[in-house]
């Protein structure tokens, strides 16, 4: 039996594929290429992530997050499709959610009313969330980030390569992480799921 057949994914491979988790952009970051995160390039130029590496990084990230007191972990996104996944993740894991604009000084100026203390920052897109990443670096706060093929890697301590733009991808990623963090803490059994499916983490499109 091949190593690929023996590897146990956190969710069935088909779930990753249907959610578009492995789909990158047409731009490529050599830093990610050199680390083997980018598996292939489609004829249309779209970069494809290695799903096994995504899965492996999710397992490591969950162990890392589980080491911190939940109220010392700040999860931030300015990407609208990330609002619901981040809020649901924080609901189940107990972390602090910060969605929308990141006000300068949030991590660096304790005199501001919106000041937040954190021992770990988790961002959805380091390009859009650059202010938060820069402030975390200044304060010595480690940063976990979802990174697409076009994402800069500066100041990121741990990268999770994935499609960090799609609704379904973000929902599945945060659902997996929430479940895995709770398993790492012993709050869920190793074979136990969250009480809601990944679809409940998904941002709903509003019909106009």
From Swiss-Prot:
Molecular function terms from GO: structural constituent of ribosome
InterPro entries documented for this protein: Ribosomal_uS2, Ribosomal_uS2_arc, Ribosomal_uS2_euk/arc, Ribosomal_uS2_flav_dom_sf
Keyword match Ribosomal protein: yes
Entry's Gene Ontology cellular component terms: small ribosomal subunit
GO BP terms: translation
TM segment ranges: none
Disordered: annotated span: 189-208
UniProt entry keywords in alphabetical sequence: Ribonucleoprotein, Ribosomal protein
NCBIfam families found in the cross-reference section: uS2_euk_arch (TIGR01012)
HAMAP family reported in the protein's UniProt record: Ribosomal_uS2_A (MF_00291_A)
Annotated family: Belongs to the universal ribosomal protein uS2 family.
Protein's name in the database: Small ribosomal subunit protein uS2
Organism lineage string: Archaea, Thermoproteota, Thermoprotei, Thermoproteales, Thermoproteaceae
């Amino acid at each position: 039996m091949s190593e690929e057949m023996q590897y146990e994914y956190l969710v069935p491979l088909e779930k990753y594929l249907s959610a578009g988790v492995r789909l990158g952009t047409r731009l490529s970051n050599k830093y990610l290429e050199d680390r083997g995160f980018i598996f292939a390039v489609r004829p249309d130029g779209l970069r494809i992530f290695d799903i096994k590496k995504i899965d492996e990084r999710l397992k490591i990230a969950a162990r890392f997050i589980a080491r911190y007191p939940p109220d010392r972990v700040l999860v931030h996104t300015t990407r609208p499709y990330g609002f619901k996944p981040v809020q649901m993740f924080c609901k189940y894991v107990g972390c602090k959610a910060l969605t929308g604009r990141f006000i300068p000084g949030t991590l660096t100026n304790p005199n501001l009313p919106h000041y937040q203390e954190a021992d770990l920052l988790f961002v959805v897109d380091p390009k859009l969330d650059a202010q938060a990443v820069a402030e975390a670096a200044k304060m010595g706060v480690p940063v976990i980030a979802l990174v697409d093929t076009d994402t800069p890697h500066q100041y990121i301590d741990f990268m999770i390569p994935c499609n960090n733009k799609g609704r379904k991808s973000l929902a599945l990623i945060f659902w997996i992480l929430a479940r895995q963090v709770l398993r790492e803490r012993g709050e869920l059994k190793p074979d136990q799921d969250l009480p809601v499916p990944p679809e409940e983490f998904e941002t709903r499109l509003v019909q106009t």
